[in-house]
A protein has these predicted regions:
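Short helix- or helix-capping micro-motifs
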Residues: 116-127, 131, 151
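Transmembrane-helix motifs of polytopic, lipid-linked glycan transferases
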Residues: 85-109, 148, 152
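Loop-to-helix entry region of an early transmembrane alpha helix in multi-pass inner-membrane enzymes
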Residues: 57, 63, 67-74, 79-96, ...
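Membrane-interface transmembrane helices that cradle and orient dolichyl/undecaprenyl
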Residues: 107-113, 149-166
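Membrane-interface starts of transmembrane alpha-helices
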Residues: 8, 81-89, 111-119
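Transmembrane signal-anchor helices characteristic of membrane glycosylation enzymes that use polyprenol
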Residues: 4-39, 125
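Extracytosolic helix-loop segments that constitute the early lumenal/periplasmic catalytic or substrate-binding loops
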Residues: 18-20, 36-61, 68-71
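Short acidic/glycine- and proline-prone juxtamembrane loop motifs at membrane-interface regions
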Residues: 131-141
Length: 167
């Protein structure tokens, strides 16, 4: 019962993100403008790596972002040739962030309590998470990589403790 309730809530909140995508939700207020400003960098990287890096490095405003996001998205754009496909793919990828956060909390606190689940899905209510997922901005990808690294760090720490106990 508890498991089905969690899945239902997660699916419902995921659907709200898809509805936000369909209706061009801009809950943070600046994501649509950021997308229009940053999308040419993605296009430049999809033409060629050299052109992309040249334009990226020549613009001081772009240097606050990592070029990895632009490289990954431009690669997807190049192979699919569809911005809608890339946007939906990125939206689906962003749906992993609450799951990763849930895994972090579960590993750290060694429990599968409902409170941990509710804490992890609060991410869906963040206007910045929603806007970044909907408008193809790199913030969520950074958080996904960071969360994955935390999970591996926690597992490493657990393994280290187990090895100490065996000695």
């Amino acid at each position: 019962m508890f498991f089905n309730k969690k899945i239902s809530i997660y699916v419902f909140l995921s659907l709200t993100l898809f509805f936000g995508f369909i209706f061009d939700e801009n809950s943070s207020g600046g994501a649509k403008i950021d997308h229009k400003y940053l999308f040419p960098f993605i296009e430049n990287f999809s033409y060629s790596l050299e052109t992309g890096l040249k334009n990226f490095l020549s613009n001081s405003a772009s240097l606050i972002h990592s070029p990895i996001f632009y490289l990954l998205i431009s690669f997807l754009l190049k192979i699919s040739n569809s911005l809608i496909f890339v946007s939906v793919f990125y939206l689906l990828l962003c749906l992993s962030l609450p799951l990763l956060f849930y895994q972090i909390l579960k590993e750290k606190f060694k429990t599968d309590d409902i409170i941990i689940f509710y804490l992890s899905i609060i991410i869906f209510l963040s206007p910045y998470f929603r806007s970044s997922a909907i408008w193809l901005l790199g913030d969520n990808l950074s958080l996904i990589f960071f969360s994955a690294s935390i999970i591996y760090f926690l597992k490493f720490e657990q393994d280290k403790e187990k090895r100490k106990l065996k000695e």
